[in-house]
Amino acid sequence: MTAKAPRVGMISLGCPKALVDSERILTQLRMEGYEVVATYEDADVVVVNTCGFIDTAKAESLEVIGEAIKENGKVIVTGCMGVDASVIRAVHPSVLSVTGPQQYEQVVNAVHDVVPPRKDHNPLIDLVPPQGVKLTPRHYAYLKISEGCNHSCSFCIIPSMRGKLVSRPVGDVLDEAKRLVKSGVKELLVISQDTSAYGVDVKYRTGFWDGQPVKTRMTELCQALGSMGVWVRLHYVYPYPHVDELIPLMAAGKILPYLDIPFQHASPKILKLMKRPAFEDKTLARIKNWREQCPDLIIRSTFIVGFPGETEEDFQYLLDWLTEAQLDRVGCFQYSPVEGAPANLLDAAIVPDDVKQDRWDRFMAHQQAISAARLQMKIGKEIEVLIDEVDDRGAVGRCFFDAPEIDGNVFIGLEDGSTVQPGDKIMCRVTDADEYDLWAEML
C-alpha cells in the first residue's frame, strides 16, 4: 500500500518578491513528494510567508498567523517579519519555526520536522514541471533577478531584512525565463528591490547564455529577454542614468513601453529627508525626452504623503509636479512610521493623521483626473489585450499599460460561442474609459 503524500498549505503575504520566495519553497517541497493544498483542513502543516514592510503589513501578518494556528494548529513562519522572531513568538508562542526571508532550506527542514517526506517517494513519478510551482495564472509569471538593496531610504527597513544587493547570475535568470516561456507564459514581470541596479554588485561581469556572452546588466538582460517573443514588463526601476538605454528597446517593441519607477515625492526638501535623489526638475526633462523617443511609454509610480517635515507648500509642489509629469498609473500611501526606520529619528515636524488623510484625498483626486484624461485619449485606438479571465459576461484582460493586480483592466464583451480563453492575446478597439479601466470590443 502506498503511503499518503504529506500535505502542505502556503499563505503568501506582501509583494511579488515574497510570492517568488513562496514559489521556490513549494517547488522544493513538491520535488520531495509533498502535495500542495488550498485549505487549512487538508494541510498537515501551514507555512505563512510574512510581510514586515510597514506596521499595517505586520499587523496583517500576525492576524493571518493567528488564523492559521486556530484553523490548523501547525504553523511555520517565514519572510520579512521573521527577521525578528521575538515579535512573532510574543504574540503567537505556539508557532513551530520562525525564519527570515530567503531562508528556503530552513523552511523546508522545518516542514520535514513536522511531517517528514514519504520514504517511498519516486521523483520520476511525481515530476515537477521545469518552471517549478507557480502561484500566478499560467500566462504570466514574476522573474526575480536579484535580492536586497544598496539604498538607505530613511522610510524603509528592507535592507535590514533582505540585505544588500545580490544579483542572480544572468545565465540563470535567462534560463528560468526560457523555461517559463516554454511552459506557456505570455508575460514576464521583472522584479527585484532595485531592478536598474542589476549587476552592480558583480561589476556587471560577463556571463553566458545559449553559448553567447551576456553582461550582468539591466540593458543587456532586457535585450536578451526581448528576444523571447513575450511581453517583458519592468518593475521597481530606480531612475539611474542608464535607464535611458531602455527607451529605444521599448520604442522598437523589444520590451513593453512600461516603467514602474517609485518616485516617492517631488519636493527637494522631502526627497532629501527621505534620502532619495532630489533631481525632480531633471526627472521631468527625462520623462519628456523618454516620451519623445517612445510616445507609447506608460509610467507608473508610487508616492508617500504626510512624511515628517512635509508642509502644505511641499505638498502643493508635489501636486504641481504631477501636473507637469502626467504620469499614467499612480499609487499613494500615507506615511506610517516603521519600527527601526531612520525616519523615526528625523528632527522634523510630525504631520497629523487628519492632515495626512486630507492630503491623500487631494492627491488621489488630482491624479485621478490626470489618469482619466490620459485614458480618454485611448478611445478609438486598437490595442492588443492579454486575457486574464473569461465568464458569461465577457472577458477581462490587460493591455501593455496594465500590470496585474496593481493597474487597470480592459473589459471586453464577447459574442456567444466565443473561444477566447485566459492567456489569449486578442486585438480590440477601445470604446470607453474611466480613471482606471478601459472598455473595448474585439476586432
Curated annotation (Swiss-Prot):
Domain of life: Bacteria
Cofactors demanded by this protein: [4Fe-4S] cluster
EC number, UniProt record: 2.8.4.4
Top enzyme category: transferase
Binding, [4Fe-4S] cluster 2: 149, 153, 156
Domain Radical SAM core, first and last residues per copy: 135-373
Task performed by this protein: Catalyzes the methylthiolation of an aspartic acid residue of ribosomal protein uS12.
HAMAP family assigned: MTTase_RimO (MF_01865)
Family the entry assigns: Belongs to the methylthiotransferase family. RimO subfamily.
Name of this protein: Ribosomal protein uS12 methylthiotransferase RimO
Organism phylogeny: Bacteria, Pseudomonadati, Pseudomonadota, Gammaproteobacteria, Pseudomonadales
Gene name tied to this protein: rimO
